[in-house]
Structure formats: structure tokens, C-alpha cells
Amino acid sequence: MLSEVLLVSAPGKVILHGEHAVVHGKVALAVSLNLRTFLRLQPHSNGKVDLSLPNIGIKRAWDVARLQSLDTSFLEQGDVTTPTSEQVEKLKEVAGLPDDCAVTERLAVLAFLYLYLSICRKQRALPSLDIVVWSELPPGAGLGSSAAYSVCLAAALLTVCEEIPNPLKDGDCVNRWTKEDLELINKWAFQGERMIHGNPSGVDNAVSTWGGALRYHQGKISSLKRSPALQILLTNTKVPRNTRALVAGVRNRLLKFPEIVAPLLTSIDAISLECERVLGEMGEAPAPEQYLVLEELIDMNQHHLNALGVGHASLDQLCQVTRARGLHSKLTGAGGGGCGITLLKPGLEQPEVEATKQALTSCGFDCLETSIGAPGVSIHSATSLDSRVQQALDGL
């Protein structure tokens, strides 16, 4: 087992095109969001395994000897396995969480224990570890925060247990694992996501593992070969939404008006495919006119999503504010509030960007400038992380 400190990060995700249509067998494009979750793992010898999640105020510790003495045969040794309902109940006993524990805390702890016990039980003795996870991603905003958490845990635990090698060499600031190792990280992260979401699609953990852009179609996930990093504004309207109700609303509208809604879904599919083609071209040789196409696709998709009934007054306001400044926006994810993205073309002056952010903030929204198409799960040297991240991991 490794004895050094590991620093791992993984990105969030946004849906670029295809939300809601994907439920009806159409293509969706998901891209990594360069708001990241950071994990620090420190092996120690105090006989405890500590988990600290400062974003949601969690600090938990378990006695390694007690975990070691448990009958963990309910966790099948060998390949990556899917957690069963019996395993979940057993893990709840192991976790020792109070009955009034918040759902977010319970799920985060169960995912951690499942991955820790499943990955580390092949060791002669369960390792004594101190793990801190801090995220730039707001939870529950549809930005893949739970997947980034699961990916960071899987990567760090597999590395510390030497199931996969540490790719960080002397002198490296940051590095990534091989394709084969990333596949194993992704498989375990998917099981962590299952602990949290029950029946996830696998898109969020795949985007967080691989980075860049992915295409999702009828259960099949594939990476776009070359996708450019694009600058965006990510705006959180802070309007809560009920994803299940929004998905049901689209289904009901499709049943009520099949000849109207089915062509809308087909058209959204065509938007996703055209965007995929343009991103491929941009990866080889970016040109200004390609940004114009991306902007048109954003506008068309936003109108289609409004026609499906998943818009919201807050999202209309976001689009109006940015359109007044010559920028193009759409909702991302379930709609009905939540988040929206605004494409920032190269050459846009920083004062213009700041003025747009200010205008959106004055609407009561949270607005961040970031990029999409960021690298997937990565391992960092201590000196390469900025002081803000270091302080957050130190609990300062």
C-alpha cells in the first residue's frame, strides 16, 4: 500500500444538447465542466478511517479494527460488483448514522463505505486513512457533483491500494491515468453513483472520469475524439426544480400531441448531431464561423425546450439579459429553473463578461465564468493546487 499523500480532482458536467429528448431515445451531448471536486487522501497509523466533507458539514470516523472484524463477505471479492439492497442495509448498520441524519449525508457516507470496503478489503489489513473531499460544484444543481465525488473516491482508493499505479512522477504538476486504469475507475465510480442514485445512466461518472465531451444514446456512451475547451458563463437561477415532474410533463405532452412533440424531439436530436459535427471540426481547426453555428444551435434548442414545457421565467430572464449583450444562452439539465449556460466567444473583452455577470447577479442569480471540455479525473502535486483549494482541504 502507498504511504504518500494523494491529491485527486474530477470535473462536474453539463448537458450541452439533448436533455429530455434523451429519455425518448435521442442523442444527448454531455461535456465536462471545469468546476472540480478535490480529494486529499493521507495514510496514517492511528487505527481510524476519517471522512470529512466540509461543503455539507460532515466529519465521520470509524475504527479500522472494528471494520476489519465485520463479516464483509456481503461484498463479493473479485470484479466490480453492483450493490444489492441487502448490502445497502448492512452498510447502514456499519455506518452507524443517526435516524435523523440528512439524506445527503447518509448517501455520501454509504457511497464512501461501499467503495472503501469493496476496494480495500483485498489488502492484508484495511488501511488507516484520512480523507477530505471539497467541491466547487453546488450539490443538487444537476452538475454531476455526486459523480465527481464517486470518481475522486474510486481513483484515490484504487491508487492507495495499488490496484492501479500512481501516474504522478517526480517533477509533474498534474497527470492522468492510462485508458485501462480510467476504465476501472469509471466502473467503481458507477457503483458509488448507484449507492447515491439507485439507477443512474452512467453519463455523469463517465464525463467526470474521461473529461471532454461524450455522446449518450440509448444506453451507449462514447467519447468525442477531439472536443475543444469552450469558455462559458454558468448561471444558477437558484429556482428549485423537480426533475421527475418535468420529465413526466414532457411524456404527457408527447402522449397528448404526438404529431407536434415527436418532431420537436427529432429536431433536438438533429441539433445534438450537428453540434457533435461542429465540435469535431473545431477540435481540428477552430474558425470564427463555427462559433456562430454553436450560437444558433443554442438558440434553437432553447426554443424547443420551451415548447416542450420545461422552460421557466428565470431562464427566460437569463436569455434576455445575455441576448441584450449579444450572447446566447440555454438551460442545461432538467429545466424548470436550475442552471443555464452562456457561450463566450473568443475575443470577448473581459469588461463585457464582467458586466454580463453583474447583470445576472443583480437578477438574484449566481454566475461563474468557467470552461467546458476540461480534463477528466487527474492527480496533482501538492504545489500545483491553488491556495484556495489547499485552504479548503485544510478546513481553513
From Swiss-Prot:
Subcellular location, record wording: Cytoplasm; Peroxisome
InterPro entries (alphabetical): GHMP_kinase_C_dom, GHMP_kinase_C_sf, GHMP_kinase_N_dom, GHMP_knse_ATP-bd_CS, Mev_gal_kin, Ribosomal_Su5_D2-typ_SF, Ribsml_uS5_D2-typ_fold_subgr
Effect the entry attributes to changing residue 204 to A: No change in protein stability. Loss of kinase activity. Normal affinities for ATP and mevalonate
Effect annotated for changing residue 193 to Q: No change in protein stability. Decreased kinase activity. Approximately 50-fold decrease in Vmax. Approximately 20- and 40-fold decrease affinities for ATP and mevalonate, respectively
Top EC category: transferase
UniProt pathway annotation: Isoprenoid biosynthesis; isopentenyl diphosphate biosynthesis via mevalonate pathway; isopentenyl diphosphate from (R)-mevalonate: step 1/3
Active site: 146 (proton donor), 204 (proton acceptor)
Activity-regulation annotation: Farnesyl pyrophosphate and geranyl pyrophosphate inhibit mevalonate kinase activity by binding competitively at the ATP-binding sites.
GO process terms (BP): cholesterol biosynthetic process; isopentenyl diphosphate biosynthetic process, mevalonate pathway; isoprenoid biosynthetic process; negative regulation of inflammatory response
Catalytic activity reported: (R)-mevalonate + ATP = (R)-5-phosphomevalonate + ADP + H(+)
Phenotype when changing residue 149 to A: No effect on kinase activity. Approximately 4- and 8-fold decrease affinities for ATP and mevalonate, respectively
Enzyme Commission number(s) from the entry: 2.7.1.36
Record's keyword annotation contains Cell membrane: no
Keywords, comma-separated and alphabetical: ATP-binding, Cataract, Cholesterol biosynthesis, Cholesterol metabolism, Cytoplasm, Disease variant, Kinase, Lipid biosynthesis, Lipid metabolism, Magnesium, Metal-binding, Nucleotide-binding, Peroxisome, Steroid biosynthesis, Steroid metabolism, Sterol biosynthesis, Sterol metabolism, Transferase
Record: residues binding ATP: 13, 55, 135, 140-146
Entry-linked SUPFAM superfamilies: GHMP Kinase, C-terminal domain, Ribosomal protein S5 domain 2-like
Gene Ontology MF terms: ATP binding; identical protein binding; magnesium ion binding; mevalonate kinase activity
Gene Ontology CC entries for this record: cytosol; intracellular membrane-bounded organelle; peroxisome
UniProt function note: Catalyzes the phosphorylation of mevalonate to mevalonate 5-phosphate, a key step in isoprenoid and cholesterol biosynthesis.
PANTHER family membership: MEVALONATE KINASE (PTHR43290:SF2)
Protein name per the record: Mevalonate kinase
Taxonomic classification: Eukaryota, Metazoa, Chordata, Craniata, Vertebrata
Primary gene name: MVK
